[in-house]
């Protein structure tokens, strides 16, 4: 099972033995990030296909992750339409993230898609950064408002869509303390935090 789809398969599809179409990116065992690491955070990005990154200032963290990924992918291989995408919960996050990206002075990054889950449905990127944007209980209620129960399981459609948009790597950012109030996000944080 592809790393980015294992959680949705287990939690939302009741392990219905979904089999991915055998594509080359699904068979890769390591991420192709050849540049030397700047620090331990780079090492984490290189080692994990799915990773939860705790953050209070998500826009700054997302911009920093974009800078690091761009450095690893390299200007020759980077393609804004395929390499990286950012999914957000709230439209106002787009402006916050773009403002932080402008500070990086990397013009190629300005062309990446940053949009809500609904707008990402049907498209994919090699790397997806999902900025959850949850700072309080009200935000968490909004984030999980599309959940429903089926056969005794809680299914979160937005989370399912977001987690299955990544071809190679899924990075999620958010407020750990608030997200842990929800059983599904608590499990994600437990599985994918380092």
What feature does the model see in each segment?
Residues 25-31, 102, 116-118:
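Conserved P-loop NTPase motor core of helicases/translocases
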Residues 1-68, 123-125, 161-167, 171-194:
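Helicase-core coupling region on the C-terminal RecA-like lobe
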Residues 142-170:
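Conserved SF2 helicase motif VI
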Residues 60, 76, 120, 145-151:
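Short, contiguous acidic/charged loop-to-helix segments that flank catalytic cores in large enzymes
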């Amino acid at each position: 099972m592809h790393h980015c789809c294992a959680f949705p398969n287990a939690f939302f599809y009741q392990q219905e033995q979904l089999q991915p179409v055998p594509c080359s990116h699904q068979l890769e065992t390591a991420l192709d990030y050849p540049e030397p690491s700047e620090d331990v955070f780079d090492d984490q990005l290189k080692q994990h296909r799915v990773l939860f990154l705790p953050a209070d200032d998500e826009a700054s963290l997302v911009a920093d992750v974009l800078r690091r990924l761009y450095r690893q992918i390299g200007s020759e291989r980077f393609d804004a339409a395929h390499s990286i995408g950012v999914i957000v919960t709230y439209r106002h996050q787009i402006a916050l993230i773009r403002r932080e990206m402008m500070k990086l002075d990397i013009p190629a990054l300005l062309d990446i898609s940053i949009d809500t889950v609904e707008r990402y449905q049907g498209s994919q990127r090699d790397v997806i950064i999902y900025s959850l944007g949850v700072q309080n209980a009200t935000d968490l209620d909004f984030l999980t408002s599309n959940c429903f129960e089926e056969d005794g399981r809680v299914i979160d459609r937005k989370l399912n869509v977001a987690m299955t948009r990544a071809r190679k790597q899924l990075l999620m950012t958010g407020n750990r303390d608030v997200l842990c109030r929800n059983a599904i996000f608590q499990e994600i944080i437990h599985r994918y935090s380092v």
